[in-house]
Amino acid sequence: MIDRYSLLRPWLFCIDPEKAHNLTLSNLDRAQRWGFLERLITKPINDPQVLCGIEFSNPVGLAAGLDKDGKYIDALAALGFGFLEIGTVTPRPQPGNPKPRMFRLPEAQAIINRMGFNNDGVEACVARVRCSKFWQNGGVLGMNIGKNASTPIEEASRDYILAMEAVYEIATYITINISSPNTQNLRALQGEEMLRELLGSLGEARKHLCDRHGVRKPLFLKIAPNLDQGDINLIADLLLEFGIDAVIATNTTISRDAVKGMEFGEEAGGLSGAPVRNASNIVIKALKARLGNQLPIIGVGGIMSGVDAREKIMAGASLVQLYSGLIYRGPDLVYKCATVLRQP
């Protein structure tokens, strides 16, 4: 598949990034529905990993953001991922930020986006999840939740609780996204006072949902790379205090040091891809040093090869997730990463 993708990529890179993104996913979905995709993709790697009571078929997952609305679940599952994370979804539909809002920086193997949680709303996404064969067959599917842009930051807990209630029945795990730079003030939720309030509220809501549904769903927290040691230690301690089950490190960065002077390098938004790799690894190592084996870490950020995926595991992650690497390396990156991670 990678050879085919290397032929397609120059053509895709001539198209507006967001249009290319949607076109690629639509064609993947069409190929999957017609039965062609499985013939083009290398057989998935079976390398079971158990984390938070969940069995992942292999340790390579899809990061949130690629399929925000659950429209392409079965097509993406066919690429060989061990798990998928859908979203970010919000309680109410919202259009996101004005276009253009996605930019490629090929020289740095990077993407800048300021999408702004554009999505059809959590209820529409849940309906699509229920229709997917992947979910019906018991595939591991995380739901990434956020707050609406119109909701004041002081009332953020309300939105997260509404979204959690909506996805609870269909999610294998639920990720609390407080680290996107594209929703005003969202990252303020990583501060001690607001994070305590949010995690406490979600913990209470989960207890009620557990009683109602008879099952305790794991809660993961996704954090930013732009954190100092004190911030990381504080967040790690709060995760343990409030019974959060895992941490995803990291989201996109607001730093532009690695892309200075490049076309689009000064665009507002979150920078992902190769430039965030080291920053993500540093956060993972710091979390591991603080948490030890008390809480698992999922590593994401800048994985462009199997070696990069291995670095995340060596830094302290138990699983990894891909996004920008798929844009630059193509679907075969899933197989390559899973193959390297299966090796002793």
UniProtKB/Swiss-Prot annotation:
Binding site for FMN: A64, G65, L66, D67, K68, T88, N144, N177, K222, T250, G273, G302, Y323, S324
PROSITE patterns found in the cross-reference section: DHODEHASE_1, DHODEHASE_2
InterPro entries according to UniProt: Aldolase_TIM, DHO_dehydrogenase, Dihydroorotate_DH_1_2, Dihydroorotate_DH_2, Dihydroorotate_DH_cat, Dihydroorotate_DH_CS
GO biological process: 'de novo' pyrimidine nucleobase biosynthetic process; 'de novo' UMP biosynthetic process
EC number: 1.3.5.2
Comment on bound cofactor: Binds 1 FMN per subunit.
Annotated metabolic or biological route of this protein: Pyrimidine metabolism; UMP biosynthesis via de novo pathway; orotate from (S)-dihydroorotate (quinone route): step 1/1
Gene3D superfamilies per the UniProt record, alphabetical: Aldolase class I
Database matches in HAMAP family: DHO_dh_type2
Membership in a protein family: Belongs to the dihydroorotate dehydrogenase family. Type 2 subfamily.
PANTHER family reported in the protein's UniProt record: DIHYDROOROTATE DEHYDROGENASE (QUINONE), MITOCHONDRIAL (PTHR48109:SF4), DIHYDROOROTATE DEHYDROGENASE (QUINONE), MITOCHONDRIAL-RELATED (PTHR48109)
Name of the protein: Dihydroorotate dehydrogenase (quinone)
Annotated source species: Polynucleobacter necessarius subsp. necessarius (strain STIR1)
Higher taxonomy: Bacteria, Pseudomonadati, Pseudomonadota, Betaproteobacteria, Burkholderiales
